[in-house]
């Protein structure tokens, strides 16, 4: 075990703060319509130009281990928000930083960190309740276009593309991003289906940055069996597919240890690009979903019921797809063949729904039907250079996530406006309800809620404090349009944020900030010179 450096109390918090200053400064320059870009040097290939908070946060690694711990902690606020809402990562970082900065000042002045934390949590819960109260449900395609446009950095083309995609595949539909061969970004609707199961092992991952497996033109093995005996269950399929030089997706009940090890070895040695996924659902429903997948991919479900076995099967029994994307928790299959078979299967499901008496059964059939008929909207991202392509893809991804979040929980005025208006209500509530250091915690949150708008204004070259005061005196819908430097009705101007993103940014920022404020000791490796 290496030698450790141990810091206590104020020294510990100060060391963390130094790292946070660096990360917050680098990330916050991208906030708002006039936010700047950040260039990331890559070990291989061209540098990447990005405007995405979480991507920048993931790249920052400092030499000083103590400072780096601070970076890692505040990075969690961005990562957590990205996992929950898929957008709002820069705002989460700015909020977390604002709460921590003020909190540390209060702790240094003698406030009790535990009581302070309680105050921060109570104030956060109040704000979250208010956000949900003010949220307006998505009513039309224009709302969707505006949410997507704002999230993609004010790109009108992206806004209408995503709105069209959701219009075509429905609110529950799948949207996939691909790199285009041309410079144009276009939308294509294909046959496809997704389900909530991810890869069995991280060794299958092909894209470590996004932690996902992408297979082009794969064969697909569908079975309701457990794959246990390597020689009988696996080898015949692996031999068939390895001759074709195409990847393989296995969807089965489970893959036992020895069989999984065989697949991983084949993958790591480059013999076969393969990924294994557990089949969705249980019992008869699982068999039915596998049958849906078989119709979509033109394959057979290898099951004893149909007299098929893994030992004696042919390449014709395997399904095929144009593309498969497997994440930690989801799998998307994009196929563009078998249109007639899919339509026939949908008709069959509709007839089953008509004859079924059980409400539960009808719901499940409706779910399957929606997945089959919805298809997948594939947005082919085009750009003149690879650097622009990567930046555009990140913006599109944010926009897709933000739009889905907006559909889920509704929309609120964007540009930090909602937080400013709720801050005024929070101030009254905190003064009436909280006392002592809890009151201080509430006031910290009230002040931190102003930070995103101040930063947006600062990035636009304006005085943030003056803008905040002007917004405070206005109605709830009124906010600051940094693109035109005007005070406007945010709904009319189309500057809106998903309530889910606004809520998640504050919840994650407050959670990380509370943990850091209650830190009394840091233990890190003494492998580098620490200050």
From Swiss-Prot:
Enzyme class: isomerase
EC number: 5.6.1.7
UniProt binding sites for ATP: 30-33, 87-91, 415, 481-483, 497
Main location: plastid
Domain of life of the organism encoding this protein: Eukaryota
Location of the protein in the cell: Plastid, Chloroplast
Catalysed reaction, written as an equation: ATP + H2O + a folded polypeptide = ADP + phosphate + an unfolded polypeptide
Record InterPro entries: Chaperonin_Cpn60_CS, Cpn60/GroEL, Cpn60/GroEL/TCP-1, GroEL-like_apical_dom_sf, GROEL-like_equatorial_sf, TCP-1-like_intermed_sf
GO terms for biological process, alphabetical: protein refolding
Job description of the protein: Together with its co-chaperonin GroES, plays an essential role in assisting protein folding. The GroEL-GroES system forms a nano-cage that allows encapsulation of the non-native substrate proteins and provides a physical environment optimized to promote and accelerate protein folding.
Oligomeric and partner information: Forms a cylinder of 14 subunits composed of two heptameric rings stacked back-to-back. Interacts with the co-chaperonin GroES.
Assigned protein family: Belongs to the chaperonin (HSP60) family.
Protein name: Chaperonin GroEL, chloroplastic
């Amino acid at each position: 075990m290496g030698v450790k450096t141990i810091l206590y109390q104020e020294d510990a918090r100060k060391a963390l703060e130094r790292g946070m200053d660096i990360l917050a400064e680098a990330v916050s320059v991208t906030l708002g319509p006039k936010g700047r870009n950040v260039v990331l040097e890559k070990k291989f290939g061209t540098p990447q130009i990005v405007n995405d908070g979480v991507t920048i946060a993931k790249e920052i690694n400092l030499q000083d281990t103590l400072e780096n711990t601070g970076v890692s902690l505040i990075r969690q606020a961005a990562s957590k928000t990205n996992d929950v809402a898929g957008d709002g990562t820069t705002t989460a970082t700015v909020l977390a930083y604002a709460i921590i900065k003020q909190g540390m000042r209060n702790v240094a002045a003698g406030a009790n960190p535990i009581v302070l934390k309680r105050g921060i949590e109570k104030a956060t819960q109040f704000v979250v309740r208010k956000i949900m109260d003010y949220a307006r449900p998505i009513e039309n395609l224009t709302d969707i276009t505006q949410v997507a446009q704002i999230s993609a950095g004010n790109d009108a083309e992206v806004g209408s593309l995503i709105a069209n995609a959701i219009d075509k595949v429905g609110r529950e539909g799948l949207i996939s991003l691909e790199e285009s061969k041309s410079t144009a970004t276009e939308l294509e609707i294909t046959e496809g289906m997704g389900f909530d199961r991810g890869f069995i092992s991280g060794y299958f991952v092909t894209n470590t940055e996004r932690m996902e497996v992408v297979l082009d033109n794969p064969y697909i093995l569908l079975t309701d069996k457990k794959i246990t005996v390597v020689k009988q269950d696996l080898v015949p399929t692996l031999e068939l597919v390895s001759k074709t030089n195409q990847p393989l997706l296995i969807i089965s009940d489970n893959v036992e240890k020895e069989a999984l090890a065989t697949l991983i070895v084949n993958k790591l040695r480059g013999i076969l690009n393969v990924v294994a996924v557990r089949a969705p659902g249980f019992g008869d429903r699982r068999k039915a979903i596998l049958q849906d997948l078989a119709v979509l991919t033109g394959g057979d479900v290898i099951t004893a019921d149909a007299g098929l076995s893994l030992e004696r099967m042919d390449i014709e029994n395997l399904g095929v797809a144009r593309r498969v994307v497997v994440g930690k928790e989801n799998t998307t299959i994009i196929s563009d063949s078998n249109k007639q078979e899919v339509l026939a299967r949908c008709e069959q499901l509709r007839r089953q729904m008509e004859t079924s008496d059980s409400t539960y059964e009808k719901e499940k059939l409706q779910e399957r039907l929606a997945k089959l008929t919805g298809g997948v909207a594939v947005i082919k991202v085009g750009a003149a250079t690879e650097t622009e392509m990567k930046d555009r893809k990140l913006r599109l991804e944010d926009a897709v996530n933000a739009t889905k979040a907006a559909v889920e929980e509704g929309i609120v005025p964007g540009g930090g406006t909602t937080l400013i208006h709720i801050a005024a209500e929070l101030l009254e509530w905190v003064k009436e309800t909280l006392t002592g250091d809890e009151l201080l915690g509430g006031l910290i949150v009230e002040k931190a809620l102003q930070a995103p708008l101040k930063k947006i204004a600062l990035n636009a070259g304006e005085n943030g404090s003056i803008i905040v005061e002007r917004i405070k005196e206005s109605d709830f819908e009124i906010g600051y349009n940094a693109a035109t430097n005007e005070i406007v009705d945010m709904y009319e101007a189309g500057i809106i944020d998903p309530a889910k993103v606004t809520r998640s940014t504050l919840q994650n920022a407050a959670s990380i900030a509370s943990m850091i404020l209650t830190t009394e000791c840091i233990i890190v490796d003494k492998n580098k010179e620490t200050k």
